Structures are given as structure tokens and as C-alpha cells.
């Protein structure tokens, strides 16, 4: 049986696009079969983590809020292996930072400010990218529970996720909202031909026929 495309799977998971941005010349995809692969998996995490917001994070809505969506603008990645750099820059700019994709990439890879290779990253390098550009961040060591998504978003914190294709390779996305009524999460994606803003059922995002959520960077804060 032919496997479902990500677009078809997304439709089945109540995924929809709020906007579409044009592809850049250096990050164009050949189609849905050409999967983004800008993330390197170093460990397999099977345990769902429950993570409290970092000390000092301000709760922005009441704990009983049914849904919450943070103000977030998802950039398109400038190179085919820069999903993580696009997400890092997008998160920081949405939270008051100024780092470009190239600057975030250089901080994560430890290269000079004017140069960063088009290479995939490991989670620790993305955490280093945040810390090297004036932010703090924490590796959760796995996917986080829906209640942790709620508490992070309610505290005004965007989360970077690492998903890994069953066919190999990985991709970075960003959680920017939730809806408790149907246990769904709102996800930003930097790949040029994918829907920029999506909504996924939490359990289906955790694991499905095409990918598995394995990593999360949480408690991302400026300063």
C-alpha cells in the first residue's frame, strides 16, 4: 500500500494552512517525497516528559484557558538543512530577539559570525544557538506531555520540536499554541513547500506513519 503524503496525513490530522510563504531559491524542494532533513537524532526518547515553566516566567492567561495562541511568525528556511536555524531565529524574533538564521546557525555550530555551513544540527547545538544569541533554553530529553505544552504556552514560551521520519532523517518545527477542547497543538514549519502554520491532534503528532516526535527544546527565554 502506498504511504500517505505528509499533506494527506496532515489533512487527516486536522492540519490547515493559515498562510503560505514563497520558497527561497536555495531551499526549494522537489516535492513531498523530498523530505527535509536538517536534524540529527542522537538518542531515542520513548518517555513523555512533563516540564514546568522556568522560574520567573509570567503566566499570560488563566490556567483554565481552553486555548491559547502566541504571536509567532514562522520564517522559511534559507537553506535545505537550516530548519533548525530558521526556527531558532523565528522564535527569538517573536520573543524580542534580533538574530538572523545565519547568526543563529553560527552560534549553534560555533563558527565565525559571517559564515555557517548548510548542515543539519543536533539538539545540543540548537540549545547552544539560543544561549549564544542572548537566550536561555533547555533540552527536555524527549517529547512533552499536552499539559506541559499548555503550561509552556500559557507562560508565553515557544517550544522547538524535533521530529524524525520513519524513512530516516529529521526536521525541526515550533509549537506556538494549543486547543484543549480537542487536544490539538499549533505548529510552525519552515520547509518551503509545507504548510507554514498547522494544527495537529496531539497524539497523532506524537507518532504516526511518517514521523515520530522525539525531542523538545523548552523554557526558551530572552536574557
Regions found by a protein language model. Name each.
Residues 21-23, 79, 171:
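Generic detector of short, well-ordered, non-transmembrane alpha-helical segments enriched
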Residues 67-112:
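Active-site nucleophile-adjacent alpha helix/oxyanion-hole segment immediately C-terminal to the catalytic cysteine
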Residues 29-57, 103-223:
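Conserved active-site-adjacent core of cysteine acyl-enzyme catalytic domains
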Amino acid at each position: 500500500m502506498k504511504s500517505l503524503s505528509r499533506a494527506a496525513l496532515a489533512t487527516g490530522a486536522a492540519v490547515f494552512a493559515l498562510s503560505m510563504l514563497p520558497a527561497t531559491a536555495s531551499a526549494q524542494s522537489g516535492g513531498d517525497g523530498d523530505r527535509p532533513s536538517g536534524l540529527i537524532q542522537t538518542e531515542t526518547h520513548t518517555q513523555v516528559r512533563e516540564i514546568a515553566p522556568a522560574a520567573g516566567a509570567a503566566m499570560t492567561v488563566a490556567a483554565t484557558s481552553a486555548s491559547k495562541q502566541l504571536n509567532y511568525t514562522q520564517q522559511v528556511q534559507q537553506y535545505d538543512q537550516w530548519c533548525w536555524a530558521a526556527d531558532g531565529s523565528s522564535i527569538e524574533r517573536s520573543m524580542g530577539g534580533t538574530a538572523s538564521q545565519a547568526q543563529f546557525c553560527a552560534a549553534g555550530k560555533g563558527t565565525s559570525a559571517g559564515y555557517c555551513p548548510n548542515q543539519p544540527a543536533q539538539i545540543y547545538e540548537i540549545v547552544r544557538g539560543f544561549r549564544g544569541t542572548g537566550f536561555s533554553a533547555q533540552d527536555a530529553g524527549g517529547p512533552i506531555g499536552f499539559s506541559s505544552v499548555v503550561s509552556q504556552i500559557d507562560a508565553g514560551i515557544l517550544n522547538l520540536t524535533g521530529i524524525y521520519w520513519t524513512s530516516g532523517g529529521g526536521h525541526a518545527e515550533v509549537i506556538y499554541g494549543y486547543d484543549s477542547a480537542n487536544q490539538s497543538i499549533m505548529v510552525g514549519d519552515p520547509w518551503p513547500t509545507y504548510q507554514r502554520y498547522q494544527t495537529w491532534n496531539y497524539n497523532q503528532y506524537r507518532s504516526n506513519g511518517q514521523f515520530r516526535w522525539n525531542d523538545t527544546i523548552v523554557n526558551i527565554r530572552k536574557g
